[in-house]
From Swiss-Prot:
Residues 30-55 are annotated as: Disordered. Residues 20-86 form a propeptide. Residues 87-285 form the Peptidase M12A domain. It is found in: Cytoplasm; Cell membrane; Cytoplasmic vesicle, Secretory vesicle, Cortical granule. It comes from Coturnix japonica (Japanese quail). This is Astacin-like metalloendopeptidase.
């Protein structure tokens, strides 16, 4: 049973819960793709949506450290299984192979002790990789190299492909957050923590005086790291929090430079630059954008001029509210029978396996407003190789923003 079938199966058993191609122009988002334009969670298995009262240290990595403090395993940087050779942190053989169709299929097996809700949470975290990148996690058949995802003593992973069956520990309870699962899977793909980049001193200052000697190796810099020619990402799912490993309450161990007020770390999951790095490392061509905003707008590339042929783009909207309302202001897609050519499709969640809110829609009639049941909504735009039209323009708001507008009125 592959990932798609497992998701359908678990969705049937249980109620649903809850790049880089750079986009042409964007505001109020950090975006990824050539065919779109942009302006501008909560079950126990989704990283909770942030609130205005969240602590700046309430980030994914600090949750990992809290769980791992009782682990008996020796871990580098808090959650990485040491390799036999230090030079392996820049090895070309640590990456998973790409198939002829451009997809990177990574076999996995799941711990049989996981319950159905644990499985659902892990599969939903995996599904975002498949939606936003060319990484597909597939159930193992007979492959030699594969991931063993099990509930061991904490949240941890190997760095990259090590050969044979390799463990990704996702402990029941403490590690069952989408952001944590994605953090550990990103290690398995071959990514280190963001602060260990060779160019990190241009972007952050390490406050060594607040780091105990035993923890200083966790802040080492890899001089030969592969930065992929992409910017440093303060909001990466792989970034430490500002006070990670501090030995003095209230004193930061990592300070952004030159602007120390920049927030580092987050609790939602993959960032746009995380997605961009995956796609560049694995030579993927994906048109995908993550929008972390309470309101904004999006439109097809070239709008109001005609969009391009053979487009396949997605936008993942993540808000602080429970619900998202999508309103199409203009809509003009080539009409075909059953909308099998060009279409827009909207999902109630973060992947193409999520429930459908608006099925394939084409033509020139403006669709009715679409409202999600959670803080996540995915919009998919697909075109074939035939004639095109002017495309679409849409705006979105969160329930929180709507309440504010209603209060003012």
């Amino acid at each position: 049973m592959d990932l798609k079938m497992l998701l359908i199966f678990t969705a049937f058993l249980l109620p649903a819960v809850l790049g880089f191609p750079i986009q042409d122009n964007y505001e109020n988002s950090t975006a990824t793709s050539e065919s779109t334009q942009v302006t501008t969670e909560e079950s126990i298995y989704d990283s909770p949506s942030p609130t205005e009262t969240d602590s700046e240290d309430d980030v994914i990595f600090n949750r990992i450290l809290e769980v791992n403090k009782d682990s008996s395993r020796y871990l580098q940087e808090g959650d990485i299984v040491p390799r036999r050779s230090r030079s392996a942190f820049n090895c070309r053989n640590c990456y998973w192979p790409q198939s002829m169709d451009g997809i990177v299929r990574i076999p996995y097996v799941l711990d049989p002790t996981y319950e159905e809700n644990h499985v659902r949470g892990i599969l939903e975290a995996m599904a975002e990789f498949e939606t936003l990148t060319c990484i597909n996690f597939v159930k193992r058949k007979t492959e030699r190299d594969y991931l063993i995802i099990r509930s061991a003593d904490g949240c941890w992973s190997n760095y990259g492909k090590v050969g044979g069956g390799q463990t990704v520990s996702v402990m029941k309870g403490g590690c069952m957050w989408k952001g944590i699962i994605q953090h550990e899977l990103d290690h398995a793909l071959g990514f280190l923590h963001e602060h260990s980049r060779s160019d990190r001193d241009k972007y952050v200052k390490i406050m060594w005086e607040y780091i105990s000697p035993a923890c200083r190796p966790d802040f080492r810099k890899f001089e030969n790291s592969n930065n992929l020619g992409l910017p440093y990402d303060y909001s990466s799912v792989m970034h430490y929090g500002p006070h990670t490993f501090t030995n003095t309450t209230g004193k930061a161990t990592i300070v952004p430079v030159p602007d120390g007020s920049v927030h580092i770390g987050q609790r939602l999951g993959l960032s746009n630059l995380d997605v961009a790095k995956i796609n560049k490392l694995y030579n993927c061509s994906r048109c995908s954008t993550i929008i972390d905003a309470a309101f904004g707008s999006l439109k097809s590339a070239n709008y109001p001029r005609n969009y391009s042929d053979n487009t396949n783009c997605v936008w993942l909207i993540r808000t602080r509210s429970r619900k998202i309302s999508l309103h199409f202001r203009d809509f003009d897609l080539r009409r075909t029978r059953g909308c099998q050519g060009d279409y827009v499709k909207v999902y109630d969640g973060s992947s193409k396996y999520s429930p459908v809110l608006m099925n394939k829609t084409c033509g020139s009639q403006i669709p009715t407003d679409v409202v999600s049941s959670s803080s996540l909504m995915l919009i998919e735009f697909v075109t074939d190789g035939r004639d095109t039209a002017s495309g679409f323009q849409a705006t979105f708001t969160s329930a929180r923003m709507q309440r504010r507008f209603n209060t003012r009125n």
